[in-house]
Amino acid sequence: MTNTPSSAPSPLTYRDAGVDIDAGNALVERIKPLVKRSFRPEVMGGLGGFGALFDLSNKYREPVLVSGTDGVGTKLKLAHQLNRHDTIGIDLVAMCVNDVLVQGAEPLFFLDYFATGKLDIDTAAAVVGGIANGCTEAGCALIGGETAEMPDMYAPGEYDLAGFTVAAVEKSELKDGASVAAGDVLIGIASSGPHSNGYSLVRRIYDRAGRPADLELEGGVKLVDALMAPTRLYVKPILSLLKSHGEAIHGMAHITGGGLTENIIRVVPDGLGLDIQASSWTLPPVFQWLQKEGAVADSEMWRTFNCGIGFVLIVAADQVAAVSDAVKAQGLEHWTIGQVVTAEGAERVHIG
């Protein structure tokens, strides 16, 4: 059937369908200076290529590549609710690079994925700016990424994030937990807050408490500031520690989903367990508030939140003092929180 002029459909564009290519290009131009600040000498070329290039040839003799990917969970929902978008990108970087750091690897480069229903340039620039700042702090290059505008896929004003990192470590210096032994000591390094885990429970408690945005915790910090504090980046101080005390550090753990109960044990060989003394550090005010308002059992706290311990070193017993002094010299608050013990059966972690 031939359409008559009166019935001919009006011409459509991609913008009519909800995708604004010009807005995407404008975002790229806006973030270029932020991204380039994160570049390392090994980065080849600039932004915009089909693939990002990184020259690994000069620094490593026997490099082992360590890759990681992660998101920030439902902390994003809280960011949307509070309209705070400038630090959530730091969370994204930290969740990825702190993970690969556990194996002694130096993060080399990072890529991000930002997806939204309708691109808001200001919001996206704030998020990517946070990612670039996180990469700069971690010493890795924000080498590429993807911004996807997908109409009808997300609620108005919302977006999703994912991050990807590649790190490298000399084969002879890889930390895999194989040397962890009974008697080794756990040094817990302070977190900056809940980091990016447990936020489905955080949001449920926050909602049930009436969303007290102006509430001040002990010490004068606002609750919302404590909840939105970006995940601490441990990369540079830990890499420095590995250079000076690598032989003494038998294993490491990033305390993420699963909390203290499930993360440290991941790098402990079979036949060994953990005895963690909860009294060795004070539960930070934000966790005290969450536990009280949510009537959360101790066991649930330990397996959901980091409870103030964001990263753990497993250290030879005769080297604890030296490593502890080195951690202090890096400006990191820390505590001796327990030790590795012999353990058989399913219950390998005791927190008391």
From Swiss-Prot:
It comes from the Bacteria. It comes from Stenotrophomonas maltophilia (strain K279a). It catalyses: 2-formamido-N(1)-(5-O-phospho-beta-D-ribosyl)acetamidine + ATP = 5-amino-1-(5-phospho-beta-D-ribosyl)imidazole + ADP + phosphate + H(+). HAMAP family: AIRS. Pathway: Purine metabolism; IMP biosynthesis via de novo pathway; 5-amino-1-(5-phospho-D-ribosyl)imidazole from N(2)-formyl-N(1)-(5-phospho-D-ribosyl)glycinamide: step 2/2. Its main location: cytoplasm. NCBIfam families: purM. One of its GO terms (biological process) is 'de novo' IMP biosynthetic process. Belongs to the AIR synthase family. One of its GO terms (cellular component) is cytosol. Its EC number is 6.3.3.1. PANTHER family: TRIFUNCTIONAL PURINE BIOSYNTHETIC PROTEIN ADENOSINE-3, TRIFUNCTIONAL PURINE BIOSYNTHETIC PROTEIN ADENOSINE-3-RELATED. Keywords: ATP-binding, Cytoplasm, Ligase, Nucleotide-binding, Purine biosynthesis. This is Phosphoribosylformylglycinamidine cyclo-ligase. CDD domains: PurM (cd02196). SUPFAM superfamilies: PurM C-terminal domain-like (SSF56042), PurM N-terminal domain-like (SSF55326).
